[in-house]
């Protein structure tokens, strides 16, 4: 049988991937050569809807990277896109090799046409992937997705410094000085170093020992690597659960493109790494992370991007904006289960829509976000409003003042356990960038923590200079805060200064300040009681209609989103002139009031308040999708400003003026008794003094009013949280 195979040539494809096709049949899978060829054909020959060659042109104009849509790969070759989805770690390096080769051939052709034969620039081309598929939930990603392509959305809460990651490590044998280069696994993977040297010893030569290799850093090849921490979007976290985090690894041209607080949509390879080598018996337990191969920053207040409005939705929104009762209808959707408070609802509607951001020629940014403070008695639905806004705003973070520190609200510097380096982690004001921060119990915050949000409220940035990290984070958020007066309830016998225990610096940053009082009126109490009983009685029926309510909330959320993205109104000339006159008039009234009472207003009326009225006017125009704010919008903005901030500034000031002769006489008698009871410099408990004068037949409210007037004349002073009175004169 000799010579039976003469003349035939047999070969084996050594480049076959280690994984075979289904059933272990290698022929059913793509070979390395055929995959490389198909990738080249795709980059060269794929045509867009207009007949152009998008990827070929992209490579010529940008030699470093090219973004490939998986949907285009699907249309070109379904098998190829399937391989990219299921085995991205194997096929993406091939794709990048194909891109480098296509770029080299294209550049040599371009050089040939000009008549100058240049050597084509060789270099690695990074492939970025993009997809229009829906994002997976962070909680749903498990072992089934290992080594596959996944797409998730979230908000960046931390970013590490850039490190150098070796792609090829050069090893030197300590014994025979021979050199070997071994590749490194991409992402957070390391290199596999052989135990023995390849050198064959000569007769009489001592063989190389085990583990003879030492790394030569100067001869190794590196790429930039950065790790990010991605957290679930606040609106996606189930109630009562902590938000989940995912570690991301970005390299080459993706490093230093993301700052904490940025909302991202990420495509990457779900991988694992060994977190710590010190854990005994945990060799098989690995930590998951995502090696990013494509990311997209979400625009404005929408984690899915603003382009996902259908034509039907846009038509519906535009029709709604043309309705004469659009403003009233929107306000009725704010807190529908809350009775009354129509002006507060209108203010919250303005806060949700926001004004227009502006950038001046000298680079200064003027904020468009509106801040609202609700100050008043308990059980006046303040927290209900905050909870409603948290559900309705496209981006919202809810926090309580007592449980919030300065670092938790702004940003903290944390030391990484493994690398011992510091990195930034954004707080509530950073995470809500482009949305609303709801702060309950605002008055219970420590003053040093409250000061931390001054810059975030006006300049819309947070400056950090800690542990060698000096940076500025964006914090373009609206603040909706709720607070109680000093004594828990608003005391009409006290001035606004005595009721509001907040500094002027923080009060001037709020555009609207509402004093919400629990007024005891028979008819109103009856209507409120009837409304609350109906809400509770129809609870069972309402649960079946819950879908309708949630649909209404979703519609409002989408409408707010659409208005914020598409409409940027500006003031008309008539509106600007009217605004100027009204502002000067308000300042004049406040100056006159301060002159009459001898005390400055508790809530200052400054240029910030003028800007607040401009923002309110723009917000009212934005609700109607109009590009110009008219005098009618300015009129309504002034009305809101008058019933909130101006009323709050005036409240309690003239309480002791224009008293009836009988009451004035009683107050004088009370003052005389107080002076007889207390010598100059002596002190007494307020409660004890009131009880003693009560036993003498004096009304408690008269005694309190007398103390208030004496305090204003600086004759008595309060100490120990207003529990003790000291007579001064």
Swiss-Prot record:
One of its GO terms (biological process) is DNA replication initiation. SUPFAM superfamilies: Nucleic acid-binding proteins (SSF50249), P-loop containing nucleoside triphosphate hydrolases (SSF52540). Its main location: nucleus. Its EC number is 3.6.4.12. The keyword Hydrolase applies. Pfam families: MCM, MCM5_C, MCM_lid, MCM_N, MCM_OB. InterPro entries: MCM (IPR031327), MCM5 (IPR008048), MCM5_C (IPR054125), MCM_CS (IPR018525), MCM_dom (IPR001208), MCM_lid (IPR041562), MCM_N (IPR027925), MCM_OB (IPR033762). A motif (Arginine finger) lies at residues 508-511. Coiled coil: none annotated. It is found in: Nucleus. Residues 326-532 form the MCM domain. Keywords: ATP-binding, Cell cycle, DNA replication, DNA-binding, Helicase, Hydrolase, Nucleotide-binding, Nucleus. ATP binds at residues 376-383. It catalyses: ATP + H2O = ADP + phosphate + H(+). GO terms for cellular component: MCM complex; nucleus. It is an enzyme of class 3 (hydrolase). Probable component of the MCM2-7 complex (MCM complex) that may function as a DNA helicase and which is essential to undergo a single round of replication initiation and elongation per cell cycle in eukaryotic cells. Belongs to the MCM family. This is DNA replication licensing factor MCM5. It comes from Oryza sativa subsp. indica. The lineage of its organism: Eukaryota, Viridiplantae, Streptophyta, Embryophyta, Tracheophyta. The gene is MCM5.
């Amino acid at each position: 049988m000799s010579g039976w195979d003469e003349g035939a040539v047999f070969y084996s494809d050594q480049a076959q991937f280690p994984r075979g096709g289904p059933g272990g049949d290698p022929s059913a899978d793509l070979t390395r050569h055929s995959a490389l060829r198909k990738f080249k054909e795709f980059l060269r020959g794929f045509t867009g809807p207009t007949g152009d060659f998008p990827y070929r042109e992209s490579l010529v104009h940008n030699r470093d990277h090219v973004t490939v849509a998986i949907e285009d790969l699907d249309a070109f070759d379904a098998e190829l896109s399937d391989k990219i989805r299921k085995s991205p770690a194997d096929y993406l390096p091939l794709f990048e090799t194909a891109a480098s080769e296509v770029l080299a051939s294209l550049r040599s052709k371009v050089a040939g046409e000009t008549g100058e034969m240049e050597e084509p620039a060789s270099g690695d081309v990074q492939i970025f992937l993009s997809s229009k598929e829906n994002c997976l939930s962070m909680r749903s990603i498990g072992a089934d997705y290992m080594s596959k392509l996944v797409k998730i959305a979230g908000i960046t809460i931390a970013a590490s410094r850039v490190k150098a990651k070796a792609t090829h490590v050069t090893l030197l044998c300590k014994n025979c000085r021979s050199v070997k280069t071994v590749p490194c696994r991409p992402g957070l993977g390391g290199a596999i170093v052989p135990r023995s040297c390849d050198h064959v010893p000569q007769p009489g030569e001592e063989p190389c020992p085990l583990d003879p290799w030492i790394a030569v850093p100067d001869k190794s090849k590196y790429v930039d690597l950065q790790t990010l921490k991605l957290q679930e979007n606040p609106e996606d976290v189930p109630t009562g659960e902590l938000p989940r985090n995912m570690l991301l690894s970005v390299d080459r041209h993706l490093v230093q493109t993301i700052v904490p607080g940025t909302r991202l949509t990420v495509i990457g390879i779900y991988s694992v790494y060994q977190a710590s080598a010190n854990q005994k018996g945990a060799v098989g337990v690995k930590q998951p992370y995502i090696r990013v191969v494509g990311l997209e920053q979400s625009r404005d207040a929408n984690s899915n991007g603003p382009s996902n409005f259908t034509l039907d939705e846009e038509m519906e929104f535009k029709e709604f904006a043309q309705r004469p009762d659009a403003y009233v209808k929107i306000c009725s959707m704010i807190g529908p289960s809350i009775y009354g408070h129509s002006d507060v609802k209108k203010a919250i509607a303005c806060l949700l829509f926001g004004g227009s951001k502006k950038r001046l020629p000298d680079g200064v940014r003027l904020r468009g976000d509106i801040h609202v403070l609700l100050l008043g008695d308990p059980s006046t639905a303040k927290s209900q409003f905050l909870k409603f806004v948290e559900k309705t705003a496209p981006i919202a973070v809810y926090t309580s003042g007592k449980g919030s520190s300065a670092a938790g609200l702004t940003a903290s510097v944390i030391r990484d356990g493994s690398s011992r380096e510091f990195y930034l982690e954004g707080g509530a004001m950073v995470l809500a960038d482009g949305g609303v921060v709801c702060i309950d119990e605002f008055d219970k915050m420590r003053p040093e923590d409250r000061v931390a949000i001054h810059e975030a409220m006006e300049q819309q940035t947070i400056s950090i200079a800690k542990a060698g990290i000096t940076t500025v984070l964006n914090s373009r958020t609206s603040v909706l805060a709720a607070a109680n007066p000093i004594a828990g309830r608003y005391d009409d016998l006290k001035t606004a200064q005595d009721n509001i225990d907040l500094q002027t610096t923080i009060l001037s940053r709020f555009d609207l300040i509402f004093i919400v009082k629990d007024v005891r009126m028979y008819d109103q109490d009856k209507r409120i009681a009837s409304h609350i009983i109906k809400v509770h009685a129809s609870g069972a029926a309402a649960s079946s209609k819950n879908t309708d309510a949630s649909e209404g909330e979703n519609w409002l959320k989408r409408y707010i989103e659409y208005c914020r993205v598409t409409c940027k109104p500006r003031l008309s000339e008539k509106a600007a002139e009217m605004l100027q006159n009204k502002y000067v008039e308000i300042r004049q009234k406040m100056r006159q009031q301060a002159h009459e009472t001898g005390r400055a207003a508790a809530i200052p009326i400054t240029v910030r308040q003028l800007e607040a009225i401009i923002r309110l006017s723009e917000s009212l125009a934005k609700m109607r999708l109009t590009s110009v704010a008219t005098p009618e919008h300015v009129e309504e903005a002034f009305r809101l400003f008058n019933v909130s901030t101006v009323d709050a500034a005036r409240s309690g000031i003239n309480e002791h003026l224009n008293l009836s002769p009988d009451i004035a006489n009683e107050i004088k008698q009370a003052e005389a008794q107080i002076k007889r009871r207390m010598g100059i410099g002596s002190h007494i408990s307020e409660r004890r003094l009131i009880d003693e004068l009560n036993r003498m037949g004096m009304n408690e409210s008269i005694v309190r009013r007398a103390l208030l007037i004496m305090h204003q004349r600086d004759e008595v002073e309060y100490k120990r949280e207003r529990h003790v009175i000291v007579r001064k004169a």
